[in-house]
Structures are given as structure tokens and as C-alpha cells.
Amino acid sequence: MAQLCRHHINKWVTSEIILGVVFLVCGCAIYLLFRSKSLNLYQWCMLLGLSDSIDSLRYSVQHWNITEWVRYSLPDGLYCAAYILIIDAIWKNDNHLIKYIIISLVPIVTIGSEILQYLRLVKGTFDVYDLICYSIPPIIYLIYTYNSFMFNKLKTQSL
């Protein structure tokens, strides 16, 4: 039984890591294909000798009409989701407070900076779509964590 449970956890961890990497790659792809070449990510790809391939891809999608929020806000939400998934996978069997503090760092900083931009306390342009994209991953994670906790609590009580 314990081996079956361990196998289930390992599959879940693998799924979380794969999904986190997919979110990260999708966010990077949006940046590389639809954003300015002056961004650091493009410069890093240039150093790796990937600029010709990326330029070819950029040319092939140049007529795609994607919305502003997909171009500018969605990648950051995908990065936030990737961070949460990968950190949760790394600390899967640990339910200490430090795990949740570490998972909360990126969402708190991103949401906080967006709110501070709105209040004009930090430099930058407030964008409600950024705020939404930063907020959705931690909200989903909180709902998932709460439901898992309640399910495990009910399961233990019924034994």
C-alpha cells in the first residue's frame, strides 16, 4: 500500500514538473515571438546562437494578431504558475510553513509590485491584466491545497 502511494506521489510530482516546464516554455515562446528583441531572454538566446532560428519563427508569426494581454501579461502569469508548480513538486511531501512561505514569495512580490505601481509608490505601469494573471495561479493553488487538506482530513477521520 505504501509503495502504491509513493508511486502515485512520484507520478504527481513528475506531472507538476512537466506542467511547470510547459508553462515556462510557453511564456518564453510568447516573449521570444511577440515581444521586443531588446529583452534579456532574446539576448541570452543570441548568446546561445539561436537568434537565426528565433528570427525565422518571428517572421512566420508576424501576421498573427494576438491580444495585448496575451503578449504582455500572460507570460508573467505562466512564469508564476510554473514557479508554484515546480516548488510544490520539489517540496511535495513537506507540509511545513517554510514550504508555503517559499511558494508565496513570487506571487506576493508580483502582486505587491503591481499594487504598488497602481498606488504610484514604485516605478512602472499598473496593468489590471498583469494583476489578474499574477493572481490566478496562487488562487488555484490555495483552492487545491485547501481541498487536498480537507480530503485528507475526512479520509483520516473515516478510518
Residues covered by each model-derived region:
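Bulky hydrophobic segments
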Residues: M1-L159
